[in-house]
Each structure stands twice: as C-alpha cells, then as structure tokens.
Design a protein with these regions (language model features):
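Extended hydrophobic/Leu-rich segments
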Residues: 33, 37, 68-71
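Conserved NAD+-utilizing ADP-ribose enzyme module
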Residues: 48-174
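Short, flexible loop/turn elements at secondary-structure junctions
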Residues: 13-15, 37, 103
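A broad, low-specificity signal marking well-ordered, structured residues that form hydrophobic/aromatic
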Residues: 7-9, 35-36, 96-99
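ADP-ribose/NAD+-binding catalytic cleft of ART/PARP-like enzymes
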Residues: 1-32, 49-50
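Adenosine ribonucleotide-centric catalytic and binding domains
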Residues: 30-35, 54-56
Length: 174
C-alpha cells in the first residue's frame, strides 16, 4: 500500500476519520500542530499496528557492503524491518487502514532527511479509507525482510552503529 502520485498516506486503525485536524502528537519533539502523513518511501514503516515497536534499516548511498551483509544479510534485499515475537499476533490480526490525502498542503519534515509529511491546515481524505490487508504480504510484495526477535535492543544497537540508514518507531513501548 503506497500513495499514488500527488498523494500522501495516513495509516490508522480507525476506519471512521472524515477530517484530519492538526494536533501536537504525544510522541513528537515538535510543538507545532500538524496533520501527519507519509510519502511512498516512508509508507512501509507504517505497515504495523500503531503501538508496535519496530526497528528498520535499509541500504543508503554510504552503506558499506560489510554492514549490509552483517545486518540485512547477503542476498537478502536492501531493507529489513524487525519486531519482537510478542507483536507477531497483533501484526497478523490488526485491521489497518490507509487514508489517501492530497499532497498539496503537505511539506517534508525532518533534517537532514525528511521522515514525515506534515500539513498545518485541516485535510479531508480523497475517499474512504482502504484496508491495508495482510501486513506480512505487504512486506513480502515489497521485498522487505521482516525479522522476528526475542529482544529488539541488540539489533537496534547494531543498526544505529552501522552505515545503514534507519528508523525506529515506538521503541519506548519496549
């Protein structure tokens, strides 16, 4: 599930949102109210239950072959997402929806590389929310390795010390 050209996505477990209103997210460092969304490149980071802690790593322009092989695995693609085993059932049973939003009111947020798209005005979806479906299949179809671990922290420590690009979401929930 990725946005079409001219769109961004907002993922939610709530299928009844008719209007997105800017707010200060409880988990953000930013104090300005925003409507939050993601572009096509960041969409896979949200193919999870909302509260699920996840560590994600992918090959970037400065990634060494040694780090890629050590963390992602030789011949295992360019990207890996990892969660703890305790979250597998939720990943398999969550009903996740994607809202398609017009790209125009949104701007990239984050330095040096944007990690989200934000709008400072209310935004109405372009249509009804779409069920994302089987999140394991989403990962497989995108060629993203999904790794299950007993403890996410050792993996995360290796990722952030490597030359891979990375993102960690909801890690405070561990």
């Amino acid at each position: 599930m990725r946005p079409e050209p001219g769109q961004v996505l907002h993922f939610s477990e709530d299928p009844a949102i008719t209007r997105f209103v800017p707010h200060v997210a409880a988990t953000t460092q930013y104090t300005e109210p925003y409507v939050w969304a993601v572009d096509a490149a960041r969409a896979p980071a949200y193919w999870f239950p909302r509260q699920c802690p996840r560590a994600m790593a992918w090959v970037g322009p400065t990634t060494t072959a040694a780090d890629r092989d050590r963390i992602i695995g030789a011949g295992c693609g360019d990207r890996v997402h990892a969660i703890e085993y305790d979250w597998l059932c939720a990943l398999q049973t969550v009903k996740l929806f994607a809202y398609r939003l017009p790209e125009t009111p949104f701007r990239p947020l984050g330095e040096p590389v944007p990690h989200a798209m934000v709008a400072t005005e209310p935004v109405e979806p372009l249509g009804p929310p779409e069920p994302v479906g089987d999140l394991l299949r989403c990962h497989a179809a995108a060629g993203i390795q999904l790794r299950l671990l007993d403890d996410l922290w050792p993996f995360w420590d290796e990722v952030i010390a490597s030359t891979l690009e990375f993102s960690g979401i909801r890690l405070r929930n561990l």
